[in-house]
């Protein structure tokens, strides 16, 4: 193995992030910005799609809108937490509506827009790290 191959092998895989937001332009824009920042990002527009894709893609984190057309963010989070295949996913709620009672207790983090994308990236990374530590403590 040469130095270039060794460097590539040492690079961690990008974090997989799923944006769940019913506003297509917002969801698509967030996913694109996350990709530019080195995340493996995709998006869906409903809670049901989010639950299925989170499971299929084995994502590390979801950036979850509070208000979706088929279920609210709390319900999506609860379903992720009840499923042994998705319990380890970090949940970062996001909304433009200001504070949402209980959001900090349900998910791993809460963001209110407008927010700097650098903060979004940092919160996602920190939430994934905390979630992984919590999950490791239970194993």
Model-found features: residue ranges?
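Non-catalytic signal-transmission and effector/linker regions of two-component phosphorelay proteins
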Residues: 1-16, 118-139
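Active-site residues of response regulator receiver
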Residues: 21, 65, 95
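Short acidic/polar segment at the start of the alpha1 helix of CheY-like receiver
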Residues: 23-27, 68, 117
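Two-component/phosphorelay signaling modules centered on CheY-like receiver
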Residues: 24-42
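Acidic catalytic/metal-coordinating carboxylates
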Residues: 46-49, 72-75
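Active-site beta3 strand of CheY-like receiver
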Residues: 58-63, 68
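The feature encodes the CheY-like receiver
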Residues: 69, 87
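Alpha4 helix (beta4-alpha4-beta5 surface) of REC/receiver domains from two-component response regulators
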Residues: 75, 96-113, 117-125
